[in-house]
A protein has these predicted regions:
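Glycoside hydrolase catalytic-domain groove-lining segments
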Residues: 8, 157-212
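Solvent-exposed loop/turn segments at secondary-structure junctions
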Residues: 11-15, 86-91, 135-140, 166-171, ...
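Alpha-helix N-cap and loop-to-helix initiation/capping positions
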Residues: 42-56, 97-108, 175-186, 211-221, ...
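Alpha-helical scaffolding within the catalytic cores
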Residues: 56-60, 136-154, 178-192, 217-229
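Substrate-binding cleft of secreted/luminal carbohydrate-active enzymes
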Residues: 80, 198-296
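Flexible, surface-exposed loop/gating regions in the mature catalytic domains
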Residues: 88-98, 118-182
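Aromatic-lined carbohydrate-recognition surfaces of secreted/lumenal glycan-active proteins
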Residues: 110-147, 197-211, 237-245
Length: 296
């Protein structure tokens, strides 16, 4: 209560359920590049072949937004962010460009999902906001150089926020330890120029433990950069989400966590970041306002 969830809508489902139009069972290709001549999930979505799944998701979100009285556009409505097909400019998801689909197909898929959610009554911008977030590739060079983020932009009518996912991999990858500014600034500048009227967000960021640098200091740097960054279009970062998880990446377990149940004070800089006056935490006594929800 008091917070607004952010739901990432990924364009794949469990093929064991028998849907020939869904993506692979595990979401990503088993080997990098495996998807390049096979995936056409963007086209399938745009052509309506996955509407039954999309509509079930839309109905679930509608029930959540409607609140206890189960009626939209009343005082007990809840707020939610929807993020369809994130990191589309990379090479690891089946909604990226392939031999069988283009960035235009992704745009059409994003718009189609938006329209299906509209169809169940989720049209009030006080309650639902859509986020478009490509990957900040930095020096990792994992992104597709032939299909840049701009080509995937669905348009101002369908997008309420723009942002980037950005990770400091440390020595887990060849890029080495990188500052928040290094991994975020260039990509934020880019999405700012693509959508100059939209508020900026970092829907995902993370830094691993024991990966060649000072994680606690990195959180201090994250606070500084996100608080003082101003885009070429004079926008500021209005929302930040941290990837507080442990996850296997290429067979190696990486500990991204800043807080966990065993020891939530390992990184005091993260706790300090979340408690600064210019951060709004959702809680029962301090509900996020509509203006804050919309990045105003």
């Amino acid at each position: 209560e008091g917070a607004a969830p952010l739901l990432t809508f990924e364009f794949f489902t469990n093929n064991k359920q028998g849907d020939p139009h869904a993506g692979p069972y595990d979401g990503a290709a088993k080997h990098k590049g495996d998807h390049e001549n096979t995936a056409r999930v963007d086209k399938n979505i745009a052509e309506g072949k996955l509407d039954s799944r999309i509509d079930r998701a839309a109905d679930t979100v509608r029930t959540f937004v409607a609140g206890p009285d189960n009626t939209l556009n009343t005082q007990d409505d809840r707020k939610v962010y929807i993020r369809p097909g994130h990191e589309m400019n990379g090479t690891w998801y089946r909604w990226s460009a392939t031999a069988n689909q283009t960035p235009t197909d992704y745009v059409n898929a994003f718009r189609h999902i938006h329209k299906r959610f509209d169809h169940v009554g989720l049209t009030n911008k006080d309650s639902i906001q859509y986020i478009w977030s490509p990957m900040s590739c930095g020096s990792i060079n994992d992104c597709d150089p032939t299909h840049l983020a701009r080509g995937y932009y669905p348009g101002d009518r369908y997008v309420d926020w723009v942002g980037v996912d950005a990770y400091n991999w440390g020595n887990a990858r060849s890029s080495g330890w990188q500052s928040p500014e290094t991994i975020m600034k260039q990509a934020l500048d880019e999405v700012s120029n693509i959508a100059p009227s939209k508020p900026l967000t970092i829907p995902e960021t993370g830094v691993p433990s024991n990966a060649g640098g000072d994680k606690n200091q990195w959180f201090n740097d994250l606070y500084g950069f996100t608080s003082y960054y101003i885009s070429p279009q004079k926008q500021r970062i209005k929302m930040l989400n941290y990837f507080n998880n442990k996850k296997k990446e290429d067979g190696t377990l990486i500990d991204w966590t800043a807080i966990n149940s065993a020891d939530d004070h390992r990184f005091p800089a993260f706790n300090s970041l979340a408690r600064h006056d210019n951060y709004i935490g959702g809680n029962k006594k301090n509900h996020i306002s509509t203006a804050q929800f919309q990045g105003r």
